[in-house]
């Protein structure tokens, strides 16, 4: 996949990589989680066949996208020790997409669900009391988005510093 190669090439230049995205950007943060040390995804669309918000693509393409995303998450957690944090509102469609990830990992026998905040090799779902797909905007308006992003960045900076001292 040409995007994966491009992302891998850029990521090689950094001690730590954090992928961050909202909606389909969150989907990309998960799709390429295996070339990151952490992924922070707000309302990702994982299974486009069941998502209420989806592109005009074939069912076969959507199944390949779902499988590629879940495969990347598994590689990220098992091989890289990536910390994946998925944020969702309470809107049932977004929550179903978010909860699909830990359920799929459990079904695959990948023991990574829950864990401490920012724990390596983990998938964590955080639900917020926002009942629509515009979660990142709602968090920003409530002054809650920046602390979430700042925490994720600080964790990666601390890991990079620890590795340099190591």
What are the residue ranges of the model-derived segments?
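Active-site nucleophile loop of the alpha/beta-hydrolase fold
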Residues: 41-52, 90
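Alpha/beta-hydrolase active-site loop
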Residues: 1-12
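Gly/Ala-rich beta-loop-alpha elbow adjacent to hydrolase catalytic centers
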Residues: 21-25, 29
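The feature captures the conserved acid-bearing segment of alpha/beta-hydrolase catalytic domains
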Residues: 52-138, 142-164
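Conserved hydrolase catalytic core segment
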Residues: 31-40
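Conserved alpha/beta-hydrolase fold motif
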Residues: 17-19
